[in-house]
Amino acid sequence: EVALRPSPGEEVVIGRRGSVCGDPAIKGATIGAIAAEVKGCGLGEAVKVSSIDGVQLSTPATIDCKTALTLRAWVTEGLKPAVGKRGGGVAQIRVAGSYACRPRNNQRGAKISEHGRGRAIDISGIILKDGEVITVLRDWGKGKQGEILAAMHWVACKSFGTVLGPAADRHH
């Protein structure tokens, strides 16, 4: 799970041919405001991102533009370099979660998760162009796949405000 630090209001800019957030490499749709279901949830301008820099998301991610732009930087500076030419490159990011109005780790009484503000995305793995699947659950800390995941995680730690991986808790 990666999440951004809170920031003041942000502007959503729609680009040409399905681009969002003013970045032609981020494809998706603007979905507008998401009303708060409970106090602390919701976001002013949500986007539903379907691909970033040519890499498809397994399911579109509902996030804010700051998160989308940070995710794009991570794809370019972390994910793609970590994978390199292995398997022909990255075809897909497996998204396990994005916007959801819920408490942290779905624990009753906990603070609202960054997911509830559109500032977090859970990534469970990647699929390479040759069909190879690398998952956090199966491959973390194991062989070349584990090295790829560790490199991806390290760059995410530099890009996002909060990054939770397998060492964080049983939920990640």
Language-model features and meaning:
Residues 36-38, 44, 69, 80, ...:
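Catalytic cores and adjacent binding grooves of peptidoglycan-active enzymes
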Residues 12-94:
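Active-site acidic/histidine clusters and adjacent loop/turn architecture
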Residues 60-62, 105-107, 136-139:
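Short acidic, glycine/proline-rich loop/turn micro-motifs
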Residues 54, 97-98, 141:
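Residues that form or immediately flank small-molecule/cofactor binding pockets and catalytic motifs
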Residues 84-118:
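Active-site-adjacent substructure of cysteine-protease-like catalytic cores
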